[in-house]
Amino acid sequence: NAYDGFRIFLFYLFKKIKFYWTLSLERKDKQSLYEFLFYSRSLYIVLSSMNTILDKNLSNILALKFKDITKKTQDILASENSNQDLLLFLSDEKIQDLFNDFDFFIKENSFYEGDCKDRFFKQLVALELRKKIILFRKNILKNFDLELFENSFFELAIFLEYFYRFLEIKNLNKLYEKYCKDRDKNIFSKIINNKNKFCKLLKKSSKNLKIYKG
């Protein structure tokens, strides 16, 4: 069910962000920090997207804290004094406090008390992924905005990275492998240059995901 599936997923993300937090402190290199950024952003997106499984108020608070970490990490990566800024930021007690709080909450049964906690995990993932596909396609076709495009693409890519195999849908596999696997910004120009083909694939994927509607 959603309760068990989501708990396992959050443990996985938490283990990853802690690993790259430690690695960033040890190595002080941008590659480790980019990975740390990826998982902080993943946690923000997942906690804010799937809060129907969780205590809504608490998950929203945690999501905003990971959003703040994401923003600060992006600023450091763009800074000329990135090494010094990185150490000050990652050594901040606020991050350790957040990790301690998060570690506590994901182990607590009361954290998983959302309205949909007893539904099937696969169904909830499919519905959320379909929603992201529809919104992303709408943005490309009707109301293109670069910042919104980048944000909605990343949200879609995050869910595909973790769940495209889990849902066993060929069009999702194709969507991930061809367009969402690389985190390079060049992928945006590839999508725009192949907009019609890409949007057709999004439409097919959305249609495939309807089988989980229930």
Question: Could you say what each language-model-derived stretch is?
Answer:
Residues N1-G214:
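Function-determining surface determinants
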